[in-house]
């Protein structure tokens, strides 16, 4: 929209009410998945102006043989979520296999800002291993997970905000989030 209408303003909202999905359960894996989630809300204003984040490209990665690792099923009692312990390994394997494409053929160290959705500590560890990153590369993601939890789609926006407050203009970035499928949504960007 803003490319065809330079004066346009597009408001993007991420509103997640994860606590609505809590259910009474004695299943430890289910309880642990509830414990990392939190409610959250984020907003971004997309304009044609050269300020904030310049969007350089988008990519979706569907990781094969992972369909049942993250699922949402609507039941009479509400949403039933499955969050398998196999998610981190699948993310590491899938990202590693496509690492060169994800970072545009450059080495991972050429990316200055990593805005990775902190689905959990082990997910962040898996991303670090997939790209050979040092622990500091995902410090903003770890801080958001520690301070706010996993707010589903809003979480990566919190990470972007943290990075942009501290980042230098022109820094190259890679943002990514994970979800059912198992899928990874990836955005190349520059701080402007």
Question: Regions from the language model: what does each represent?
Answer:
Residues 3-5, 13, 36:
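Conserved beta-strand/loop scaffold segments within soluble protein domains that form the structured core
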Residues 9-32, 59-76, 121-129, 150-158:
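Active-site-adjacent elements of ketosynthase-type condensing enzymes
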Residues 22-93, 97, 101, 178, ...:
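Condensing-enzyme catalytic core mediating Claisen C-C bond formation in acyl metabolism
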